[in-house]
Amino acid sequence: MIPKKAFVVKGTGVHKDKLASFELALRDAGIEKFNLVTVSSILPPNCSIVSRKEGLEELAPGQIVYCVMAKNQTNEPERMIAAAIGNAVPVDSNDYGYISEHHSFGEDERTAGIYAEDLAATMLATTLGIEFDADSAWGERERVYKASGHIFDTVHYCRCVKGDENGLWTTVVVSMVFVL
């Protein structure tokens, strides 16, 4: 049971009830009609990243669907929340990659997204035995990772919003959804 395809979705939901807010975020992302099972952070070998449209066309309502999901929620007015996933893909498509989840408060979209991307790349780099200075800035580590010849690409996806001004529950989700 190894996924051959994956796609990314993002959503936001606002409601007086926390669970309903999450449901609305899933609807906004287009994945509310599936039975979602969250899994850990491995991008399978030979797994193609496809468009949301292409991925959704291969799934049926009620289907059990595996995903890596970043989620954050608040009912504090104007509180900044972010959910992000980072993706690190190795040069050799027969090797596995990493997907990281990051959930934060007070970070803007760029900061949260870069953190998630850095985390995925660092996890992949450590499994490949790439030597690097863990205290160096992300840009420097990114150059080292890519210069090693092992890491082909890194990317991040993020949803960042301020909590509802009236204190309604606000939820953000970002998910890498797998197609078997």
UniProtKB/Swiss-Prot annotation:
Belongs to the PdaD family. It holds the Pfam family PvlArgDC. GO terms for biological process: arginine catabolic process. Binds 1 pyruvoyl group covalently per subunit. The record marks S40, S41 as: Cleavage (non-hydrolytic). Its EC number is 4.1.1.19. Keywords: Decarboxylase, Lyase, Pyruvate. InterPro entries: Pyr-dep_his/arg-deCO2ase, Pyr-dep_his/arg-deCO2ase_sand, Pyruvoyl-dep_arg_deCO2ase. Its cofactor is pyruvate. The modification Pyruvic acid (Ser) is found at S41. GO terms for molecular function: arginine decarboxylase activity. It is an enzyme of class 4 (lyase). The gene is pdaD. Disulfide bonds: none annotated. This is Pyruvoyl-dependent arginine decarboxylase. It catalyses: L-arginine + H(+) = agmatine + CO2. It comes from Methanococcoides burtonii (strain DSM 6242 / NBRC 107633 / OCM 468 / ACE-M).
